[in-house]
Amino acid sequence: MERIKELRNLMSQSRTRGILTKTTVDHMAIIKKYTSGRQEKNPSLRMKWMMAMKYPITADKRITEMVPERNEQGQTLWSKMSDAGSDRVMVSPLAVTWWNRNGQVTNTVHYPKVYKTYFDKVERLKHGTFGPVHFRNQVKIRRRVDINPGHADLSAKEAKDVIMEVVFPNEVGARILTSESQLTITKEKKEELRDCKISPLMVAYMLERELVRKTRFLPVAGGTSSIYIEVLHLTQGTCWEQMYTPGGEVRNDDVDQSLIIAARNIVRRAAVSADPLASLLEMCHSQQIGGTRMVDILRQNPTEEQAVDICKAAMGLRISSSFSFGGFTFKRTSGSSIKREEEVLTGNLQTLKIRVHEGYEEFTMVGKRATAILRKATRRLVQLIVSGRDEQSIAEAIIVAMVFSQEDCMIKAVRGDLNFVNRANQRLNPMHQLLRHFQKDAKVLFQNWGIEHIDSVMGMVGVLPDMTPSTEMSMRGIRVSKMGVDEYSSTERVVVSIDRFLRVRDQRGNVLLSPEEVSETQGTERLTITYSSSMMWEINGPESVLVNTYQWIIRNWETVKIQWSQNPAMLYNKMEFEPFQSLVPKAIRGQYSGFVRTLFQQMRDVLGTFDTTQIIKLLPFAAAPPKQSRMQFSSLTVNVRGSGMRILVRGNSPVFNYNKTTKRLTILGKDAGTLIEDPDESTSGVESAVLRGFLILGKEDRRYGPALSINELSNLAKGEKANVLIGQGDVVLVMKRKRDSSILTDSQTATKRIRMAIN
């Protein structure tokens, strides 16, 4: 107070004011401090000081033609003195006010296009719903979140090329637009921004917001998709939260969500096929999400989720170095260990071979609904500090940590045999056996763990075996905390390898991920996932397998037909028939296959018995490894709609129905496409059909020249003879009939004569 009085006193003397306004500041250190570098050292002071001047703004000379010298109140809007050091005009803030009221209005058509992200945000907020505010302790944990809704997923480099091409097309510099998305966006934006008068720099900034994913490491409790993050400041404080329902979705969140679902489906499906890695790659390459190739999305999208990371590893992309166990992401924060195989006995005296981690290590564990800090030594849990949304989530984290610790009391708590299998019916590895066992029922585990007295520590409570909190006692080494554990913040990615069973390892050989870690949660994708791979037909159940298998045969009929006659073994091994096998009762698969293959062989041997519909109908059954038996079948069973349904070997059935008149095939009542039979096949065998109007004279006769194809026969004159190539590469001598009347009888006699001629 005293100093202020003193200063006021000084300022009231005219001499002080004179000294302060006229004396030069010539202390070099001060001048250096405030003038070196372009960075403003005291922005708020600078702003206040500038705004106190009469003309704090400079503008281009053109302003003198666009803004009057004085406004209606007679105040000067710009100075006739030009700005020192440039040929610009010094302008008063009042000129801005005048312009806002009276300045010319430009064409606004480009504003919503350039500032699209802002306009969209306003719409989302307008249609969003804010609910009540609740006061409660917020367990926030820092997670890496997307803060920029509505963006494409281009890399910074790709985006830079697009922006340069759109905004500064005439600038020098090599720009290579390669990816599908780059080309589409460039074309779209050039179109939208034609004749745009908004400053190019501003357009470039706004384009960057639209094209690139921006992430921040922020404390979050609740939704992490970008449309929730944009209102984070409105929905959660230190001790309160406000309910909010967004007023619209954005494509980037939809892509992230659909990518996770697609990746999970693929990994689950690949795990049960003969060569999981090859199948997984085939599916990733043939699948589209919302019209974009899945492999392109995987290359650009930084989503970290177990299934997504397995797909990335298979494609040779780098992934995060953290590993996954029991649905939690583990990141080692200190310590180290060596691995050693050890045999242990369960409470049921079953021997398990486990890889023991020897050494002291600390980990953070981050799951969807709980997080923890784990300190462990060799086969011993030293301390576990958990926080989670509810009792259930906390219990899940405790079970995972107890199993991960490999403590003896955990292994001894096993009751009964461990024989869990994966989707491919293979036994799980011992650690996952233990995990599954205790996830089903952890009562014995918690009871046997042991209890200790605890000291009261701020923000921490004990937890008893029945999951009730306590301030006196707790399960040994385990505490529940009010504070969450932050997710691992680094975006560092490491090179990994993947084996054919989809186990992902880092360069030291530690397993980071395996199909067992992929969540079984089912969800509905927000963007259409197009599975063009036959492996994914069963995603939508048995009916889909049936329809897709037959549709595939019809679509590829030309190639299938040739393979059927020339290389059946290769045809039977096609992966497109693999899903179908799951519909055929296991016990009889081999017999069906043997029966159908024999039938097909007879068709090949006996001319004139080729039957398109029947081949298509029975072909999928021939794909199973055949068992030779003398059994004959008049119908074959497939398991669809919860029961066995019959496909008739000869004739139509509800499962497979071919309408000769309309040429349409219906499978289970659903249209499966048009089936074009070979010409005239319907009335008789293919050979006799094409030999109508010809008389078969006998075996090939070289005097009549090289064998013609059936199509070349039409050029023969009546009574002319020729050798003809028929059916399975056999050649016979024919003569074109002189009369048309007897054509009908040819069909019957041709078949007999061909056989005689060949034999």
From Swiss-Prot:
**Care to name a GO molecular-function term for this sequence?**
RNA binding
Q: Which GO terms describe its biological process?
A: 7-methylguanosine mRNA capping; cap snatching; DNA-templated transcription; symbiont-mediated suppression of host cytoplasmic pattern recognition receptor signaling pathway via inhibition of MAVS activity; symbiont-mediated suppression of host gene expression; symbiont-mediated suppression of host mRNA transcription via inhibition of RNA polymerase II activity; viral RNA genome replication
| A cellular-component GO term for this protein | host cell nucleus
**Superkingdom of origin:** Viruses
Pfam family example for this protein? Flu_PB2_1st
Which residues of this protein are annotated with the site description Mammalian adaptation?
A: K627
Q: Which InterPro entries match?
A: Flu_PB2_2nd, Flu_PB2_6th, Flu_PB2_C, Flu_PB2_CAP-bd, Flu_PB2_middle, Flu_PB2_N, INV_PB2, PB2_helical
Which SUPFAM superfamilies has this protein been placed in?
PB2 C-terminal domain-like
Where does this one sit in the cell? Virion; Host nucleus; Host mitochondrion
The UniProt family comment states:
Belongs to the influenza viruses PB2 family.
Q: What does this protein do?
A: Plays an essential role in transcription initiation and cap-stealing mechanism, in which cellular capped pre-mRNAs are used to generate primers for viral transcription. Recognizes and binds the 7-methylguanosine-containing cap of the target pre-RNA which is subsequently cleaved after 10-13 nucleotides by the viral protein PA. Plays a role in the initiation of the viral genome replication and modulates the activity of the ribonucleoprotein (RNP) complex.
Question: What is the recorded name of this protein?
Answer: Polymerase basic protein 2
What organism does this protein naturally occur in? Influenza A virus (strain A/Memphis/8/1988 H3N2)
Write the gene name. PB2
